[in-house]
Regions:
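Alpha-helical transmembrane segments
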Residues: 19-29, 84-92, 174
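Hydrophobic alpha-helical transmembrane segments
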Residues: 24-30, 157-178
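Secondary-structure boundary elements
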Residues: 32-33, 64
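Alpha-helical transmembrane segments of multipass membrane proteins
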Residues: 66, 127-131
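Short glycine/serine/threonine-biased micro-segments
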Residues: 64, 88, 125, 137, ...
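Juxtamembrane membrane-water interface segments of multi-pass membrane proteins
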Residues: 2-17, 34-57, 68-84, 93-122, ...
Length: 207
């Protein structure tokens, strides 16, 4: 576009905006559709394998949601943090899954029970989904970002409900994050002589 438009031509800005809206999402859309199709095709085999597949499903949904609402964000209200919080936690969930599915086995460390891993993924992911949904809804009603207290202008039931949803979702997400931190710390700090018994317990749990 630089050879086509002069640097001071407003049409150049319009052209780059068009690329942002209509071209940039295409690669991500192809990857998401392909991944979703693969998951659906092998859903039964994957879900019976490890809890990390559930975590990846949650991450995929959350990341997709964040991407969609990103098209409706504004730089002045809470729709912007709704978008990037969903995207960041979606990526974080993927690394959480890798932590237990790849990194811990490579270090010969024990892996926690299935139910606790699933709990951390689901609580963090669903909590963040509601957190972002509340922020996005509040932004639609004009609640400004980067302000607190009376400056938020929570003068209607809709705004209060949206911010309440944000708070509840944030609390649920924090609980999921704390569970992960405790599990991760235990994996790293557990005594070597106890690792064998934990691995055996995990194998029985998976079976």
């Amino acid at each position: 576009l630089y050879p086509i438009f002069p640097a001071d031509d407003p049409a150049q800005v319009t052209a780059f905006t068009g690329l942002y809206w209509y071209v940039l999402p295409l690669p991500a859309g192809v990857v998401l559709l392909g991944t979703g199709w693969l998951f659906l095709r092998r859903a039964r085999a994957l879900t019976e394998q490890t809890p990390e597949i559930i975590g990846l499903w949650v991450a995929l949904v959350l990341f997709g949601f964040g991407g969609v609402i990103g098209f409706f964000e504004s730089s002045v209200d809470t729709r912007t943090p709704a978008h990037y919080h969903a995207e960041l936690i979606g990526v974080t969930l993927v690394f959480m899954c890798l932590y237990f599915a790849l990194f811990m086995p490579l270090l010969d460390r024990p892996v926690p029970a299935r139910k606790w891993r699933i709990a951390s993924y689901v609580l963090l992911g669903t909590g963040q989904l509601f957190h972002s949904l509340g922020l996005f809804s509040a932004g639609l009603d004009g609640v400004a970002r980067k302000v607190a207290g009376g400056e938020q202008g929570l003068d209607s039931a809709a705004k209060l409900s949206s911010m309440a949803l944000m708070g509840v979702g944030g609390l649920v997400a924090v609980i999921g994050g704390v569970i992960f931190v405790v599990l991760a710390a235990r994996c790293l700090l557990i005594q070597p002589e106890l690792a064998a018994s934990d691995v055996a317990e995990h194998a029985t749990d998976v079976a």
